Swiss-Prot record:
Keywords: Aminoacyl-tRNA synthetase, ATP-binding, Cytoplasm, Ligase, Nucleotide-binding, Protein biosynthesis. One of its GO terms (biological process) is prolyl-tRNA aminoacylation. Consists of three domains: the N-terminal catalytic domain, the editing domain and the C-terminal anticodon-binding domain. This is Proline--tRNA ligase. Gene3D superfamilies: Anticodon-binding domain, Bira Bifunctional Protein, Domain 2, YbaK/aminoacyl-tRNA synthetase-associated domain.
């Protein structure tokens, strides 16, 4: 490949609307160009990277025993009505009509199409298990597309759907796909974590996300120093608290005239923030609920919504709070409520003795409060808080927090989609059985942006070698003035390619500084310079993308540096 015959268009300017490093560098490197909000054209350069990711994903899916298919991107409303997702998916589902006024959607995911295909193709347990995958463009009508291809409306995704007779078989394929994903992200050269996760709108019984670790990540992750435990903070749990100590103080009311937060109350009383309790008032279909967490903790909305009876809860308004507790927000607590209320206590709150709560009296709190003496034992005890950096994990290690970019997700869906679309088989006993499904997604275009977020410096991208558009670029100094240099560079290029390296020749005739800056911006792992001076000395100038300086090497030394 000669770059003089390749479309390569880099820029020095940083676009004003590009917030993330990956967005800025992809635009500057000429990998993508914006067509409309959330819609991007992938240039020849960008497509080379995209195809390399795609190739590794395809190889590992094939290795894992999945078989490739291609579902339509446009899908009929009837399928989505059957699963209830025509309405449930919300505004992200792009809905269209054809000339006959029949309704369709541009699929953001393909559970319905996969289940319908399985219904048509699979009729006996003897055909199971089967795992179908595709690599296809998807569309989600994001309200505010941003961050370039990180949160675009149109994106390239690998999605797979497996079908099984039993839950045990579904679980085996789930583990098989988790192993395949681990191989994929390892081969791509990414620092990643597989974390326990909430199933969200897809649904299902078990779920795990794969995150690329990056400071700019939108998701908070927790992982233990004691094992491979890792989880999204939506689901992460710490070790169980120590057993509750015996009460040692009498309950009494103290004045806190302007102290409405746990931090202010703790400072006024001169006590540890951990001894205070935060009361969060919410409304459910069944009525008013008071959720309690320690003052140094924060309520986890996902966990709280999973407490029986709290699905779909909302924060209570001031009128509702006054009606049930008899006071204004800022002084709320579970003692002496105006009406009977349900109390949901976090595990750490249930383990407290001699704690501090709002008195349900304006300008006052209660100190020395104890369960079973001053108020009944909590009706419900559950883990409803976010974990905190440095606390003890269940495995005995310490929890560490990091930011991550989700690039893959695996689900055990169970039978919900197959049941809705009547995807059944005849089992060993001759009876009709609804198939079990698994679902496994990888954001291929998102991986490209995530890799840049994790691997860059002030000069540009630093690609992991498997993702780089070329592993090596041979740079020619003054190609138009010295045919001998060009000939030597071409000969070197041919040898590199013969040695199994993906290499290109930069014969564009740019000034050396501009050419080298481009190579750094593009993230080329290895740069080799062929010049008249070098040829006279029998050497090539070599520099790895992450090296501080270049070095002069003979051909044997060069190939050794390149691992050949």
């Amino acid at each position: 490949m000669r770059l003089s015959q390749f479309h390569l268009h880099t820029t020095k300017e940083t676009p004003a609307d590009a917030e993330l490093v990956s967005h800025r560098l992809m635009l500057r490197a000429g990998m993508i160009r914006k067509l409309a909000s959330g819609l991007y054209t992938w240039s020849p350069l960008g497509l080379r990277v995209l195809r390399k990711v795609e190739a590794i994903v395809r190889e590992e899916m094939d290795r894992a025993g999945a078989v490739e298919v291609l579902f339509p991107t446009i899908q009929p409303r009837e399928l989505w009505d059957a699963t209830g997702r025509w309405e449930k998916f919300g505004g992200q589902l792009l809905k269209i009509k054809d000339r006959k006024e029949q309704e369709f959607c541009y699929s953001p995911t393909a559970e319905e199409a996969a289940a319908e295909f399985a219904r048509q193709e699979i009729n006996s347990y003897k055909q199971l298990p089967l795992n179908f995958y595709q690599i296809q463009t998807k569309f989600r009508d994001e309200i505010r597309p941003r961050f370039g291809v990180m949160r675009a409306r149109e994106f390239l995704m690998k999605d797979a759907y497996s079908f099984h007779l039993t839950d045990a078989d579904m679980a085996r394929e789930y583990d098989n796909m988790r192993a395949a994903y681990t191989r994929i992200f390892t081969r791509l050269g990414l620092d990643f974590r597989a974390v326990q996760a909430d199933s969200g709108a897809i649904g299902g019984d078990a779920s795990q996300e794969f995150h690329v670790i990056a400071d700019s990540g939108e998701d908070s992750l927790a992982f233990s120093t004691g094992s491979d435990y890792a989880a999204n903070v939506e689901t992460a749990s710490a070790a169980l608290p120590a057993p509750r100590a015996a009460a040692s103080e009498a309950m009494q009311q103290v004045a806190t005239p302007t102290q409405k937060t746990c931090e202010d109350v703790a400072q006024l009383l001169g006590i540890a923030l951990q001894r205070t309790v935060k009361s969060v008032a919410v409304m459910t279909e069944a009525g008013f609920v008071l959720a309690l967490v320690r003052g140094d903790h924060a309520v986890n909305e996902i966990k709280l919504a999973k407490v029986p009876g709290l699905a779909g809860y909302r924060l209570a308004n001031e009128t509702e709070i006054r009606a049930h507790l008899g006071c204004e927000p800022g002084f709320l607590g579970p003692v002496n409520t105006a009406r009977p209320v349900r109390v949901v206590a976090d595990r750490d709150v249930a383990a407290l003795a001699d704690f501090v709560v709002g008195a349900n009296v304006s300008g006052a709190h209660l100190v020395g409060v104890n369960w079973g003496r001053d108020l009944p034992e909590p009706e419900t005890v559950a883990d409803v808080r976010n974990v905190v950096e440095g606390e003890r994990a269940a495995d005995g290690g310490e929890l560490r927090l990091a930011r991550g970019i989700e690039v893959g997700h695996v689900f055990q869906l169970g039978s919900q989609y197959a049941q809705a679309l009547q995807a059944t088989v005849i089992d060993e006993g001759g009876k009709v059985a609804v198939m079990k499904m698994g679902c496994y997604g990888i954001g291929i275009s998102r991986i490209v942006a995530a890799a840049i977020e994790q691997n860059h410096d002030d000069a540009g991208i630093i690609w992991p070698a498997p993702m780089a558009p070329w592993q090596v670029v041979v740079c020619v100094i003054n190609p138009k003035q010295d045919a001998q240099v060009v000939s030597a560079a071409q000969a070197l290029l041919d040898e590199l390619i013969a040695a199994g390296l993906d290499a290109a020749l930069d014969d564009r005739g740019l000034r050396p500084g501009a050419m080298f800056a481009d190579m750094e911006l593009l993230g080329i792992p290895h740069r080799v310079v062929v010049s008249e001076r070098g040829l006279a000395a029998g050497t090539f100038e070599y520099r790895a993308r992450t090296a501080a300086a270049a070095e002069n090497l003979d051909k044997a030394g060069l190939f050794s540096r390149l691992g050949r």
